[in-house]
Amino acid sequence: MSDTTLEKIIVLDYGSQYNQLIARRIREIGVFSELMSHKVTAKEIREINPIGIILSGGPNSVYDEGSFDIDPEIFELGLPVLGICYGMQLMSYKLGGMVEAAGEREYGVAPLQLTEKSALFAGTPEVQDVLMSHGDRVTAIPEGFHVVGTSPNSPFAAVENTERNLYGIQFHPEVRHSVHGTEMLRNFALNTCGAKGNWSMENFIDMQIKDVREKVGDKKVLLGLSGGVDSSVVGVLLQRAIGDQLTSIFVDHGFLRKGEADQVMETLGGKFGLNIIKVDAQKRFMDKLVGLSDPETKRKIIGNEFVYVFDDEANKLEGVDFLAQGTLYTDVIESGTDTAQTIKSHHNVGGLPEDMQFQLIEPLNTLFKDEVRALGTQLGMPDEIVWRQPFPGPGLAIRVLGDLTEEKLETVRESDAILREEIAASGLERDVWQYFTVNTDVKSVGVMGDQRTYDYTLAIRAITSIDGMTADFAQLPWDLLQKISKRIVNEVDHVNRIVYDITSKPPATVEWQ
């Protein structure tokens, strides 16, 4: 965020798998928070002007050569600092304490015993369950610190130096297994750091509109509109900020869900008044893909062709200086931190040409996915768009296994519509993270109307998840599955068998290819 007057707590990234959760929990309290590289200097932090700092956990040992370090001057800024797990060990080590390998590693839920009163733990019980995940531990604390909590394997499970506003905890308050972790983080943010706790989507909208207007001035902005949640929210937000200075290009490649293209035009172009150039490129894409079966080849062709179509349309416009994108905070974290690891490449349609000389506008690049949905709701967008299912850039083309044909594509489009309709009617659409159908490219024998059939087998994939990184198959009611199956085989041509995918992630991925 460019506004240095905004109350914010920064989280220095030391590689913990829970880093994003720390920022999310602080935001849930009503205080803006963002991840930063552990390489940030005290001078840079002073310029950012946060009200507090959190040092995250991480896999390193502070005494190992090459372990992630910290600018020691950060502890001299006078700002409240909370060290979590590795962050606590690093703070203790840098300030004169001792850290050693634990004789017995501590992983999982453990009881934390508070030994004296601490503002950090105000309103929490004397004994509480917390999540421990560490192989090292502090064996001697720095001068000026005192112990406020212990666990069976950590005599220094919680320490503090109230004169310098420095706090350390060996456990992870950001995860739900630490039952009172949110209260502890709230105490740190609101009481120790003095935050007002008034950060909200309404404030975010006002700030972004102000930022966009200052950056863009009277110039023009181009947006690649996919119809998904992120680009749709960007479009509505920018429309509110700069009106007719925004032009959106919507490429219909022919692999969208049933009725999706019409809904985009009616809702975003109609109700919200976006200036949308719709490009009907179904034939252009299909001609390139007919008969192809390799999923990576399909993705590459669709990505490249999208770029070419977008480039063709963009070149017809004059005086465009800015390109808007729906980049989320998770994308920034994955690509921009020193500790990030990419678990799986995303399905998003390929990047835009390098020679397109635009300045970027990414108004969502400090938001998580759930916050984008909240923003869309605050902007008055309908649930059908705000709560739209995650959808891969290549669309239904990668939900057709084997060679791509119009016939197989239509089986997926029609069956997907039935699945979405029945899930919605059952009231489960907010409980299931993602659900769709796949043409497996397998044919089997069936009997319909006393006639032998030899038609396609479709798979239903439905998962539950918190963040999409791991997932379980959704245990949908049998009567609902039966109803969906019956409707599909009766209403969708060339289909005579339905199977249900009961594989979790891992070992499977969400999409089939």
Curated annotation (Swiss-Prot):
Q: In which organism is this protein found? A: Lactococcus lactis subsp. cremoris (strain SK11)
Protein name, entry field: GMP synthase [glutamine-hydrolyzing]
The reply on keyword ATP-binding is yes
| Residues that, per the record, bind ATP | S226, G227, G228, V229, D230, S231, S232
Keywords, A to Z, come to:
ATP-binding, Glutamine amidotransferase, GMP biosynthesis, Ligase, Nucleotide-binding, Purine biosynthesis
Q: What gene does the UniProt entry assign to this protein?
A: guaA
Annotated Gene Ontology cellular component terms:
cytosol
Q: State the oligomer form and interacting partners.
A: Homodimer.
Q: In which pathway does it act?
A: Purine metabolism; GMP biosynthesis; GMP from XMP (L-Gln route): step 1/1
Question: Record's InterPro entries?
Answer: Class_I_gatase-like, GATASE, GMP_synth_C, GMP_synth_GATase, GMP_synthase, GMPS_ATP_PPase_dom, NAD/GMP_synthase, Rossmann-like_a/b/a_fold
